[in-house]
Regions:
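Cytosolic, long alpha-helical scaffolding segments
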Residues: 494-731
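Multi-pass alpha-helical transmembrane bundle typical of ion/small-solute transporters
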Residues: 1-519, 680
């Protein structure tokens, strides 16, 4: 059950990304349609679980106890591993995780068996062909899906443009006919190929009459889509929702083995042992029965379908994974979830060079004509949507078509890889990756692809060790590992909720970017700015105190932790400035001229606060790391007193900003002036000590730096409060 929930939470992105990203219907409607597809796909599946029964290991050489050890290790690993990816919001392949977990667990037991046997070798116990085909699927899927996604979307955009409603008088019928025919073909070839009613005769008939079926469907659906268009029905929405249903159907029918194949193989093994193992011990009963195919009872399939639909509708982590994929494909610039990497920057530079080269040889008339087809200011995108219905349609139709063709041609294409890479290819063709966002989007894509390889490595390694522990630890180890898995899942859920609570401020930014009312935009921008600057003051307060305390107590770990926080906060500041600038662009000129300067000054002072903490922490860390002499008692006493006052000032300023209450702010101004006076006095005292040579020069240098940065913190905090008051002031 847990594996079904975490598995569906991750794989839901495959069939929900396009319809959710384009807002083809309300989220509940999309879930309802996908839920029907998932349930029908699961219920009609004939439950062939061959890969979990004998796809990786050779069961005729394994005893009942060994098989149960492998399968239990796989289940424990799979639940935890997929939950980690769901928490991170990273789409991965449940097929990859299951295959490599089976491989890791089997390899562990195979090593033990080979060591204890003179007749068996690893080749007799493990089937590595499946693992190699999965690795090959990553490379093949990435290349094929990305290229064709880019090509087909470019052609679709040239035909329809971003203002597609003006250019679909007759072309929409042909497009709809091709799209729906492709979806039907995909459902027959991939979605229903293993269904209980799909007999060998039915498959052969479809294969013999494929051309006739495709031709008939194309003619019928072309006429139907054209008629629907004349009746004012949005054909693109029909295509997107039908494509969502088809992918959900195929997912449930084909990927069900990833979730229930392993436990059902264990159940089948247990039934076989209890039925035929009389007089045999678990260590002496060979599992030859797993060589045969097993038909799963209908009630298991029905129950799996119900659980999958429940997980689809209730899992918050599924929404998190979908958000990652949608954000990477978003048409407009906005808050980017990924940073910049050297390889991404290199790829962007190479692409720009290539693009400039093509541009030089292309006729000017052709360039001007193409530019008219890609005018993004004419885009028809629903409120809150990431991209339009044309791209969503291409995503679903092309993904389904590629998967169906791959199945027919015996190419090892993965549903997860194809759907994700098609979406990335279409977004690139739509010029969604501009110069200001391309490096972040490419980093995100590379991170997801890297995660696929990490899934394989982590699944193999973790399951290998878990199987070893279970084999040698017995019942006690099983209980301990189950307890550890439960603890990990609970801890993951708690941490996820905390992280989501911290990200709640992003809701304000989302509302801001979706609003078109200037007054509302300004109010939301003020609220968003308060939320972000309060976080900066909270960071400054916490890490100023942490750095000083750690330095005075020679706590190297505390200083390293503070330095790590500074590096992370610098990235957040960059992101805050970028998203803030995008938000400012949505205000009218008069408001920008009146309030813009204060906004940008506030961001600059916030940035200076973070850099001041970094300049404070770095010499302190170096001093303690080199085991130099600590501050003397007088210096510690002086700076401890002033530190308490600075931390208190930061707390008061944070509360005032949080409550948007700037009354009696003059009290804080006077307090800040007093603190700067105290710090200047400490600086003069230390300079006097240097002149009399009464202390260590290294100690004096770091102490003077601490005083200077403490003054900077006080000054920048007050300046931040001043400009924040002016920005928040309503006239």
């Amino acid at each position: 059950m847990f594996d079904l929930i975490v598995g569906v939470s991750n794989d839901a992105v495959n069939f929900l990304q396009s319809s959710v990203g384009a807002k083809a219907a309300s989220f509940k409607t999309v879930l309802f349609i996908a839920g029907i597809g998932v349930f029908i796909g699961a219920a009609l599946s004939n439950g062939m679980m061959d890969i979990a029964r004998h796809g990786i290991y050779q069961p005729q050489h394994f005893y009942f106890a060994e098989i149960m050890c492998i399968l239990l290790a796989v289940m424990l690993t799979d639940v935890v591993l997929l939950d980690v990816f769901n928490t991170m919001g990273m789409p991965t392949s449940t097929t990859v995780s299951m295959v490599f977990e089976l491989l890791g667990g089997t390899f562990a037991l195979a090593l033990i068996k080979v060591n204890n046997s003179d007749t068996l070798g690893l080749g007799d116990l493990i089937n590595t062909d499946k693992a190699l085909s999965v690795i090959m699927a990553i490379f093949v899927s990435v290349a094929i899906a990305f290229f064709f996604g880019m090509l087909v979307q470019w052609l679709a955009r040239v035909i329809f443009t971003f203002n597609y409603k003006k250019r679909m008088k007759y072309s929409i019928g042909i497009f709809g006919g091709i799209a729906v025919t492709s979806i039907i073909y995909f459902m027959l070839i991939k979605g229903l190929k293993d269904s209980s009613f799909m007999t060998a005769d039915n498959k052969q008939w479809i294969q013999d009459n494929t051309a006739m079926l495709i031709g008939s469907c194309f003619i019928f659906f072309t006429i139907l889509m054209q008629v629907l268009h004349w009746l004012k029905v949005n054909v693109f929405k029909v295509v997107v929702l039908l494509g969502t249903f088809a992918l959900a159907l195929a997912f449930a029918g084909n990927d069900l083995v990833n979730f229930i194949g392993v436990p059902l193989a264990g159940y089948s093994s247990f039934i076989d042992f209890t039925t035929n193992g009389a007089g045999s011990s678990p260590d002496g009963f060979l599992m030859t029965s797993l060589l045969g195919p097993a038909k799963t009872p209908w009630y298991f399939l029905f129950g799996a379908g119900v659980i999958m639909v429940y997980a689809l509708c209730t899992s918050k982590k599924a929404h998190n994974v979908i958000k990652t994929s949608v954000d990477l494909a978003r048409q407009d610039e906005g808050e980017e979830n990924f940073g910049s990497t050297p390889i991404a920057r290199t790829l962007v530079r190479f692409s720009m060079t290539l693009s400039n080269g093509i541009s030089k040889v292309m006729p000017e008339g052709t360039k001007r004509w193409l530019d008219t087809r890609f005018r993004k200011d004419e885009a028809i995108i629903a409120d809150g949507a990431a991209f339009d219905l044309v791209r969503a349609s291409v995503n679903l139709v092309l993904a389904g078509l590629l998967i169906a063709l791959g199945t027919s041609l015996k190419l090892p294409l993965s549903t997860t890889y194809v759907t994700f890479m098609v979406a990335m290819g279409t977004s690139l063709a739509d010029r969604a990756w501009g110069r200001d966002s391309a490096v972040f989007r490419i980093t995100g894509v590379l991170s997801v692809i890297g995660g696929w390889f990490i899934t394989a490595g982590a699944a193999f390694t973790i399951c290998f060790f878990v199987a070893m522990v279970i084999h040698f630890g017995g019942t006690f180890a099983i209980i301990a590992l189950i307890g550890l898995a439960i603890f990990t899942l609970i801890r993951s859920q708690v941490m996820y909720k905390k992280r989501k609570a911290k990200e709640k401020g992003n809701e304000t930014l989302k509302q801001l970017m979706q609003s078109n009312n200037n007054t509302e935009i300004l109010d939301l921008l003020r609220k968003h700015t308060r939320e972000e600057l309060v976080k900066v003051l909270e960071f400054t307060e916490e890490n100023f105190e942490r750095t000083v305390t750690a330095f005075l107590h020679e706590n190297l770990r505390g200083l390293r932790r503070a330095m790590g926080s500074v590096k992370f906060e610098k990235q957040l500041i960059k992101q805050m400035k970028r998203t803030g600038t995008l938000a400012m662009c949505r205000l009218d000129n008069n408001t920008v001229l009146e309030k813009g300067l204060y906004y940008y000054q506030g961001n600059d002072f916030a940035s200076e606060l973070v850099y001041s903490i970094g300049r404070l922490c770095e010499p302190c860390l170096e001093h303690i790391d080199n085991n130099f002499k600590p501050l003397d008692t007088i210096q510690k006493g002086e700076f401890s007193d002033v530190t308490e006052d600075i931390v208190y000032l930061l707390q008061v300023c944070r509360h005032k900003m949080e409550n948007n209450d700037y009354e009696d702010f003059e009290n804080e101004l006077r307090k800040a002036n007093d603190l700067n006076g105290q710090l200047s006095h400490l600086k003069r005292e230390e300079l006097q000590r240097i002149q009399t040579q009464s202390g260590s020069i290294k100690v004096s240098m770091v102490y003077l730096t601490m005083i200077q940065e403490a003054q900077n913190v006080v000054t920048y905090t007050i300046n931040l409060m001043k400009v924040s008051r002016k920005f928040q002031l309503t006239e």
